[in-house]
């Protein structure tokens, strides 16, 4: 099995958020096939770059993709298309 690059992980994380809408950390970690602690690191990275935003869903943190995150996801998918 081939290791995933950081860009693959970012793409999988953003695709999971896009599919599920407002998503909690557990759903994102399952969808992106990451341990929860690694998913938190990825979400912090994406949040610092304004690609996802953190919201409160009741008492829990949840994440939503920003328009900039959608553009970034589309760019990653375009690059993948040319690399495969």
Q: What spans do the regions from the language model cover?
A:
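Short amphipathic alpha-helical interface segments
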Residues: 8-22
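Amphipathic alpha-helical dimerization/coiled-coil segments
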Residues: 74-84
């Amino acid at each position: 099995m081939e290791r995933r690059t950081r860009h693959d992980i970012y793409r999988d994380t953003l695709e999971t958020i896009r599919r599920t809408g407002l998503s909690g950390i557990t759903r994102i970690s399952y969808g992106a096939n990451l341990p929860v602690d690694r998913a938190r690191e990825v979400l912090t990275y994406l949040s610092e770059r304004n690609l996802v935003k953190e919201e409160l869903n009741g008492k829990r943190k949840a994440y939503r993709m920003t328009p900039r995150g959608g553009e970034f996801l589309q760019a990653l998918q375009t690059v993948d298309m040319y690399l495969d």
